[in-house]
Amino acid sequence: MGKFVVLDHPLIQHKLTIIRRKDTGSNEFRRIVGEIGGLMTYEITRDLPLEDVEIETPMGKTVQKEIAGKKLTIVPILRAGMGMLNGVLEMVPSAKIAVIGMYRDEETLKPHEYFFKAPKDIAERECLVVDPMLATGGSANDAIAALKKRGVKDIKLAVLVAAPEGIKAVQEENPDVDIYAASEDDKLLDNGYIFPGLGDAGDRLFGTK
């Protein structure tokens, strides 16, 4: 079973409180979502493999460490996942980007994939799927399925807030995927939103409500 980890660093928790507030505007919401994404990336990438590399400093040659193998691929789920992307890239600027477009049917709450674009060698890369909210788990599971269909074997999921129902759904369908969250929230409401949650993260990020 993949692990579920709440990243309870004080800075993450402080910033999460700010974006939970209903009166936080889009500009501040967008900035802080990116900041939390970066802070979470620092913790999530602790186990990236390193290799020795010979370099030359102003003082002479030396052997130092750098990330081994293919670079990490960040996979934001459109559209809300884009809010976390820049923060992650600030921590791992060499990362590649794959984009998955998903939309949720307002009546059935089921997700549908409408777009997928990724590096050609994505099957050889570790992928970090990012989306601010893990609600029913449908979008996350569909995104993970889209990656696995293309041969990806090493997948992690990073979200800001997670409902117990979404955590369970991902762990049952994808027991090989580790989930990282800034918070495990109380529950999923009948309308498909997380409580206490963030509201509609996509609308708040892009000012479309």
Curated annotation (Swiss-Prot):
InterPro entries: PRibTrfase_dom, PRTase-like, Upp_B, UPRTase/APRTase, Ura_phspho_trans. Allosterically activated by GTP. The keyword Magnesium applies. Keywords: Allosteric enzyme, Glycosyltransferase, GTP-binding, Magnesium, Nucleotide-binding, Transferase. It catalyses: UMP + diphosphate = 5-phospho-alpha-D-ribose 1-diphosphate + uracil. Its EC number is 2.4.2.9. Uracil binds at residues 194, 199-201. 5-phospho-alpha-D-ribose 1-diphosphate binds at residues 79, 104, 131-139, 200. Binds 1 Mg(2+) ion per subunit. The magnesium is bound as Mg-PRPP. Pathway: Pyrimidine metabolism; UMP biosynthesis via salvage pathway; UMP from uracil: step 1/1. Its cofactor is Mg(2+). This is Uracil phosphoribosyltransferase. It comes from Lactobacillus acidophilus (strain ATCC 700396 / NCK56 / N2 / NCFM). The lineage of its organism: Bacteria, Bacillati, Bacillota, Bacilli, Lactobacillales.
